[in-house]
A protein has these predicted regions:
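A structural signal for multi-pass alpha-helical bundles of membrane permease subunits
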Residues: 1-192
């Protein structure tokens, strides 16, 4: 979970060292007889390299969410499945996945929004290059407003981006409702 609480600038700097031509990743590749890769210095590899770093940095947060979801599943559901002689796959398919559906949608939406609002990683690692291959929406808004001093355009871009995020949130809320229109809310049985 440590990467989640680390500063994005620190994580980006760490991964710049990992991705450098003399870095640990290219050293490992050389040990397997694979040529050194340009990673963040190649227009084709820069964005996927930053995406891998972002996944590594954020996966602990998603694990905590799913762990909480797994612990919130009523054990009686699994006990009933045991009595019906359900296989492990059937329990997973018919109990675990449906119970985790709202969390899966939440994680998907938050990861998508996080990918769209990525700024620090490409700024620190590549400066938006090479050939603007790591230019993100937020990076473009930032540069339009602070470098080019086009505040009106940057504000408009930010408003459009906010509307897009709101639309994604509405989609999330729509997808997490069941057929009767109720939200998936898990309540633990009260014990007296």
């Amino acid at each position: 979970f440590v990467p989640v609480v680390m500063s994005l600038a620190v994580v980006s700097t760490l991964w710049m060292q990992i991705y450098s031509p003399e870095g640990i990743l290219n050293t490992l590749l050389a040990n397997f007889g694979i040529d050194a890769q340009p990673f963040i210095h190649s227009a084709d590899q820069a964005l996927p390299s930053i995406a891998i770093m972002s996944v590594w940095q954020g996966v602990g947060y998603q694990m905590i969410i799913f762990l909480g979801g797994l612990q919130n599943i009523n054990p009686a559901l699994y006990e009933a499945a045991e009595m019906d002689h359900a296989s492990g796959w059937q329990k997973f398919k018919d109990i675990t996945l449906p119970e985790l559906k709202p969390l899966c949608i939440f994680v998907f939406i938050t990861v998508t929004i996080g990918a769209f609002r990525m700024l620090v990683q490409p700024m620190v690692m590549t400066g938006g290059g090479p050939d603007h291959s790591t230019y993100t929406i937020v990076y473009d808004i930032y540069e339009t407003g602070t470098v080019n001093w086009e505040m009106g355009l940057a504000s408009t871009m930010a408003i459009v981006f906010t509307i897009f995020v709101v639309i994604l949130t509405i989609i999330q809320n729509t997808l997490t409702k069941d057929k009767e229109g109720r939200k998936h809310v898990h309540k633990k049985a009260k014990t007296n």
